[in-house]
A protein has these predicted regions:
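A beta-strand-loop signature enriched in Asp, Gly, Thr, and Trp
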Residues: 471-510
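Mobile, glycine-rich extracellular loop/lid and propeptide segments
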Residues: 2-287, 291-335, 339-348, 352-392, ...
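Long, well-ordered mid-to-C-terminal structural blocks that present hydrophobic/aromatic surfaces
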Residues: 376, 381-388, 397-478
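Short, contiguous acidic/charged loop-to-helix segments that flank catalytic cores in large enzymes
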Residues: 433-440, 485-499, 525-529, 563-567
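A broad structural signal for short, well-ordered beta-strand segments within beta-sheet-rich domains
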Residues: 5, 47, 113, 157, ...
């Protein structure tokens, strides 16, 4: 089995599970603990891209195991994973300066390579998408997105593949609508890259996801011709539908179908696909026939308008700005739960946030042998998608009388995933009833769940939401998920109330086939979206659960950085990588920590 990590979350199904690990067993981690082997320093403190790893690559006259890391300063590094030697670094251009125009919290110094690159091992190429200031000023309004192709051995651009400018890419949506043009000044490229049929797939959200110019884009670049081969826009008539997925990458089926999940935006089931899980098909160019990206299925739970009390099935819903929300009723559509009242928080204080409950906050992970995809967003509800026949939701399907039939298109009924509250019905005909904050905390899921087939429990999946604990589930041939247990530790225990607590758990798993599973998790102490906050690294036994006093299952911690007073800044949407006996941990203080058994 390969020990390479060539893409975000280990593989293109986005399972997050490295099943070729024989050193980092639960017994070894518990008995020996973990220590820092190497500290690798980068040129920008906020590392957003997941580290990648290639085993046994010849550089010079030496076979090496190499860690590749892209940074927000538009630099890509290659280090020897065993010695820490810097093998090369490559600068792709002047990054964009951090500002409140890009992120209201302004905790990023630079904006450059935000997404995780993808590596073509056979070709020896790393592909990265860089946000570059075209005039060198660093002003975001001069920024352009470029695709780079770097030699894995030297870090130099591949001959014949200079930086490819994506500006001006066009998409013709048909239906009598105008041709759309891609503009970098409006877009943010956070989702990890993928490769399908000889093309790099690049997904975009928007700098301001609730603006009228917000849209999701998918661009396919043919790596043989080094040209833009196809593009697709998620909201051609309306707006919104960003594809950001908290830095997760599009998930790729065995038949090369591309799965993405969109955030808040308009929905009509024809040209607008906000708040939807979408299957795309990429067809490469053939002779004089242009390449294409086309919708081949989707499923949608609700519209943003329905969340704010507008027409439940509406088409091209009004953008949900605070001023727009004033047009909607102020009481009936927002549940004022008692504990929220006790905190002095009025339901209306959530205002526009109820129209920003991104389904696409978590991305999607595929369990191909069951024919399903798992996804969850800011509501913390698990939706189990039938990836063979996702259902193709129409606006009329979202009317209360037909909601049950729309849920029936799923492979299993929705369930509460990142938390549990008996007062919340995840199979509701009226999505406005989801507008509440159980325990006065958000329970968003940011990033894909981790999936793994265990010799003990069968098919498992793990999640960890904002302000919540790590949770383990099992799922069988009936495709219904059953809760196994949770950790005692919670994310963001010191985040200020009310709400707060982004982003929850960043998790991955290492195992030796279906045995010796270890879940590796990074959680913040505070709210890692609004502020810089320290992080906490934990290792858990993935299968051998203990019992709490009430008899429920406990996921047992094997090792905890808190016990050793480790200090590192939490890397927001990033995740640890466990491979070849090492745990590679990116940080928000410019370090890549390489850990191993003590």
């Amino acid at each position: 089995m390969s020990t390479d990590v060539l893409t975000r979350s280990i593989d293109l199904a986005r399972t997050g599970a490295n099943t070729a690990e024989s050193v980092l067993t639960p017994a070894a981690v518990k008995a020996r603990g973990v220590k820092i082997l190497l500290t690798l320093q980068t040129d920008d403190p906020r590392i957003e891209a997941q580290p990648l790893y290639v085993a046994g690559i010849k550089i010079g006259e030496t076979m090496r195991n190499v860690i590749y890391q892209a940074t927000m300063a538009n630099t890509v590094y290659a280090w020897d994973a065993d010695t820490g030697d810097l093998l090369w670094k490559s600068s792709l251009g002047v990054p964009i300066n951090g500002s409140t125009a890009i992120d209201v919290h302004n905790i990023n110094v630079k904006w450059g390579i935000l997404s995780t690159p993808v590596i073509d091992r056979a070709a020896g190429i790393l592909y990265a998408c860089a946000w570059i200031s075209s005039d060198g000023s660093g002003n975001w309004q001069t920024g352009r997105h470029f695709l780079a192709a770097l030699d894995l051995v030297t870090g130099k651009p591949i001959p014949g593949k200079p930086l490819l400018n994506l500006e001006g890419t066009t998409y013709d949506p048909g239906h009598g609508l105008p041709v759309l043009q891609f503009r970098s000044v409006e877009r943010k490229q956070r989702a990890a890259l993928a490769m399908v049929k000889g093309a790099v797939i690049i997904c975009f959200g928007t700098i301001t996801e609730t603006s009228k110019t917000a849209r999701g884009w998918v661009i396919a670049v043919d790596v043989s011709t080094w040209a833009i081969a196809a593009a697709w826009c998620s909201t051609a008539r309306g707006s919104g539908g960003g594809i950001w997925m908290s830095a997760a990458g599009p998930a790729i089926q065995n038949d090369n179908s591309i799965w993405v999940v969109t955030g808040n935006g308009d929905f009509d089931g024809q040209t607008d696909f906000g708040e939807s899980a979408i299957r795309l098909r990429y067809t490469p160019a053939m002779g004089q026939v242009k390449g294409s990206l086309s919708v081949a299925g989707w499923w949608t739970p609700w519209t943003d308008g329905a969340r704010a009390g507008a027409d439940l099935k509406g088409e091209a819903a009004t953008r949900l700005t605070a001023s727009a929300l004033e047009k909607f009723p102020k009481v009936s559509n927002f549940r004022l739960v008692p504990h929220l009242a006790r905190m002095g928080v009025k339901a209306r204080d959530m205002g526009a946030a109820w129209g920003d409950q991104d389904l696409g906050a978590g991305g999607i992970v595929l369990i191909e042998h069951l024919g399903i995809g798992l996804l969850s967003g800011k509501d913390g509800i698990l939706y189990t998608i039938d990836i063979t026949n996702p259902g193709d939701t129409r606006p009329a399907d979202l009317a209360p009388a037909k909601a049950a039939m729309n849920y029936a298109k799923l492979a299993a009924q929705p369930i509460l995933y990142t938390y549990f509250d008996a007062s919340v019905d995840p199979v509701t005909p009226n999505p406005a009833t989801l507008n509440q904050l159980p325990a006065n905390r958000t329970h968003h899921l940011h990033g894909t769940p981790v999936t793994w087939f265990s010799a003990i429990h069968g098919q498992m999946h793990f999640c960890g939401g904002e302000n919540g604990n790590l949770r383990a589930w099992t799922i069988g041939p009936a495709k219904v998920s059953f809760y196994l247990g949770c950790s005692a530790e919670v994310a963001s225990p010191t985040a200020a109330v009310p709400a707060g607590g982004m982003p929850g758990w960043g998790i991955s798993l290492s195992a030796n086939g279906s045995n010796d599973g270890v879940v590796w998790g990074i959680i913040p102490y505070g709210d890692a979206n609004r502020t810089l906050t320290n992080g906490r690294l934990l290792a858990y036994d993935a299968t051998n659960l203990a019992r709490y006093a009430d008899g429920s299952g406990e996921i047992v911690a094997l090792w905890d950085s808190q016990d050793w007073n480790w200090n590192f800044l939490h890397p927001k949407f990033n995740r640890p990588v466990a491979v070849a006996g090492k745990i590679i941990v990116p940080t928000y203080d410019g370090r890549v920590m390489v850990l191993g058994l003590a």
